[in-house]
């Protein structure tokens, strides 16, 4: 029997939604390698990079898809990427960088890459786009999102419903547009939910797309 899916916005009360955030982090790691799981030993660092900033800084701009109260999809995002990035650097990135440099994640190549990117010794995918493109994204499409759906629940409309709810709330705030970065595989899905390609570059031999939606 098909399970009923509900879409819920996470509250700003961290204690209330702590189990939800744990489930979001778990799903992030189970889908973090192009939809497939990442190695178990990388889970803690991976969630600190990709989930913690949203949990700490803007939990109210994150959403979950629930089936029988189980998290089967999530969307993390914010309405103002430039402001979010400044706060994230101070509150999340710098403390994590200190721990990486001091050896907390010794042996994790992902930790080394995070440190190199934070110190601007290596560009993150989004910083590899030409400066005019990055400026256009922040000016015309200031919101951004990340999203993952459990493999069992893909192609069932869960992703579209998460995005629709996020966009509805952005429009209430009169945000002008939203962007995201992704590889080649999700492009057809995002095209189906009205995003279009603004630019594409190659990063370490793989295409990275900047997808945008004007609100």
Task: Describe the predicted segments one by one.
Residues 141-143, 147, 170-183:
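Conserved GNAT acetyl-CoA-binding A-motif
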Residues 5, 69-74:
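Glycine-rich phosphate/pyrophosphate-binding loop shared by adenosine-nucleotide-utilizing enzymes
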Residues 18, 32-50, 91-101, 105-106:
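Conserved GNAT-fold acetyl-CoA-binding loop/helix
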Residues 81-146:
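Conserved acyl-donor/pantetheine-binding loop and adjacent beta-alpha core of acyl/acetyltransferases
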């Amino acid at each position: 029997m098909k399970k009923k899916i509900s879409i819920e916005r996470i509250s700003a009360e961290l204690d209330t939604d702590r189990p939800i955030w744990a489930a979001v982090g778990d799903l992030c790691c189970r889908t973090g390698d192009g939809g497939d799981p990442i190695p178990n030993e990388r889970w803690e660092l991976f969630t600190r990079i990709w989930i913690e900033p949203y949990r700490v800084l803007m939990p109210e701009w994150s959403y979950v898809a629930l089936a029988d109260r189980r998290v089967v999809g999530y969307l993390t995002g914010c309405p103002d990427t430039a402001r979010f990035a400044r706060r994230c650097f101070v509150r999340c990135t710098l403390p994590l960088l200190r721990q990486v440099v001091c050896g907390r994640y010794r042996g994790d190549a992902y930790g080394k890459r995070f440190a190199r990117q934070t110190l601007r010794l290596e560009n993150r995918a989004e910083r590899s786009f030409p400066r005019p493109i990055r400026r256009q994204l922040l000016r015309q499409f200031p919101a951004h999102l990340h999203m993952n759906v459990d493999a069992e629940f893909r192609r069932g409309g869960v992703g579209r419903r998460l995005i629709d709810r996020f966009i509805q709330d952005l429009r209430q705030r009169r945000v002008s547009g939203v962007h995201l970065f992704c590889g080649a595989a999700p492009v057809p899905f995002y095209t189906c939910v009205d995003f279009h390609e603004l630019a594409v570059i190659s990063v370490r031999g793989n295409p990275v797309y900047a997808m945008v939606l004007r609100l």
